[in-house]
Amino acid sequence: MAKKITGYIKLQIPAAKANPSPPIGPALGQHGVNIMEFCKAFNAKTQADEGTIIPVVITVYADRSFTFITKVPPMSVLIKKAVGIESGSSVPNKNKVGKLTREQVREIATKKLPDMNAASLEAAMRTVEGTARSMGVEIVN
């Protein structure tokens, strides 16, 4: 028989930088999860992507054990990395902070597709373009 699931915890943590301080400690502590065990496992698994924010879904079981799944970084993080900027524009329609090519849009959409609810790569590309526009990034051919 499968273990009984008592809850799911969704967090966004910088890769290889999980530590027991807030927000991780309190979120895991209230479910009775061994915080240090999670931090060590997460840091080991995300060592290659150091510095990038990684969404993680932690499944907590009745015996206080856990499993976790890491997901693809948020689309805005991927766009900022591709363009090479720290943050998006404060006035997206007036100030453009960078340019993104169609090829870069396709690359981001391909990477993010498993976590999206888009039916096709083209739909995912339109979603990436919309997010980029709302950040003040221009799409160029």
UniProtKB/Swiss-Prot annotation:
Keywords: Methylation, Ribonucleoprotein, Ribosomal protein, RNA-binding, rRNA-binding. PROSITE patterns: RIBOSOMAL_L11 (PS00359). It comes from the Bacteria. GO terms for molecular function: large ribosomal subunit rRNA binding; structural constituent of ribosome. One or more lysine residues are methylated. GO terms for cellular component: cytosolic large ribosomal subunit. One of its GO terms (biological process) is translation. Signal peptide: none annotated. Forms part of the ribosomal stalk which helps the ribosome interact with GTP-bound translation factors. Part of the ribosomal stalk of the 50S ribosomal subunit. Interacts with L10 and the large rRNA to form the base of the stalk. L10 forms an elongated spine to which L12 dimers bind in a sequential fashion forming a multimeric L10(L12)X complex. Belongs to the universal ribosomal protein uL11 family. This is Large ribosomal subunit protein uL11. It comes from Geobacter sulfurreducens (strain ATCC 51573 / DSM 12127 / PCA). The gene is rplK.
